[in-house]
Amino acid sequence: MKIGVFIPIGNNGWLISETAPQYKPTFELNKTIVQKAEHYHFDFALSMIKLRGFGGKTEFWEHNMESFTLMAGLAAVTSRIQLYATAATLVMPPAIVARMAATIDSISNGRFGVNVVTGWQKPEYEQMGMWPGDDYFTRRYDYLTEYVSVLRDLWGTGHCTLDGEFFKMDDCRVSPRPQSEMKVICAGQSDAGMAFSAKHADFNFCFGKGVNTPTAFAPTAARMKTAADAENRDVSSYVLFMVIADETDEAARAKWELYKAGADAEALSWLTDQSSKDTRSGSDTNVRQMADPTSAVNINMGTLVGSWASVARMLDEIDTVPGAGGVLLTFDDFVEGIENFGRYIQPLMKTRQHIGIEQKEVA
């Protein structure tokens, strides 16, 4: 099972809480995190893109770095780990993204890929006059399909000519091209998003569900597998979980209860309000799950709370779900969390026993 880290490109990571660790994103912080992840043989690191936050007392996600430039820097200070940046496709022309990606491919020696997002938070784009109107909610995957076709053409052949609805390319060129096949990933959870991923993505991210229910995402993975099978493609699901771990179950649970008690109500209200703006998509979108009041304090990603052994056991359970290819992890404290994961949790995981063999070979 592949394991990646969803690095904290925005302040406070993924905990919307006054009692969680409070910090701003910096290159040095993310360098430390990704280098630790590489040391402990994580398979990949992903950074999101966020152009406006949720406010509140914690100013949640009001302080964000830019994804491609951050990953370019991280590419230069790592050697093995796969790196993914996120393209905000509404404000980043595909020909420019194709060239930036090819450049980072060169910096990383072929370890780079691109996560594409359509954009759901209207104020991110309205603030710069680039929101295309609310009809976009129903057309966003049509837009993304053209966008990715431009990327694939430029990376694959070095040129693109397209007379599309959203993009006009007249012998557009990119060179040098990537030395390795450029992976495109997506996080489609709605029917439209999964249909897109089934046709165009190399793998698809989805949310884990609940607290200490590691296989509850199985119906989502099954939907993705069905959609991919219909396209005769293999598109596995990579599942997003937060790990809150300690030496004992009781100590880990105490952390989780503390974070929930300090939930930033004002920031959560903003999230709920923004999730209601899209009245045209179905009820199965990512943002609908993020705003669910059940566990909005960490945007309702799956949460694994427990001792080193408990978390290791639950992570192994994820691998039993058909269609699951890996996990994308966040932590309450990333530096400490990855260190503890590498030293205490991963050695207990049956699905990561090959790591011990690799470490001996490196030594």
UniProtKB/Swiss-Prot annotation:
UniProt GO BP: alkanesulfonate catabolic process; nitrogen utilization; uracil catabolic process
Binding site for FMN: 49-50, 115, 124, 140-141, 190
Keyword Magnesium: no
Entry keyword annotation includes Ribosomal protein: no
EC number: 1.14.99.46
Any one GO molecular-function label of the UniProt entry: uracil oxygenase activity
Reaction equations catalysed: uracil + FMNH2 + NADH + O2 = (Z)-3-ureidoacrylate + FMN + NAD(+) + H2O + H(+); thymine + FMNH2 + NADH + O2 = (Z)-2-methylureidoacrylate + FMN + NAD(+) + H2O + H(+)
UniProt keyword list: Flavoprotein, FMN, Monooxygenase, NADP, Oxidoreductase
NCBIfam families: RutA
Matching HAMAP family: RutA
Family: Belongs to the NtaA/SnaA/DszA monooxygenase family. RutA subfamily.
Function statement: The FMN-N(5)-oxide reacts spontaneously with NADH to produce FMN. Requires the flavin reductase RutF to regenerate FMN in vivo.
Protein's name in the database: Pyrimidine monooxygenase RutA
Taxonomic source organism: Pantoea ananatis (strain LMG 20103)
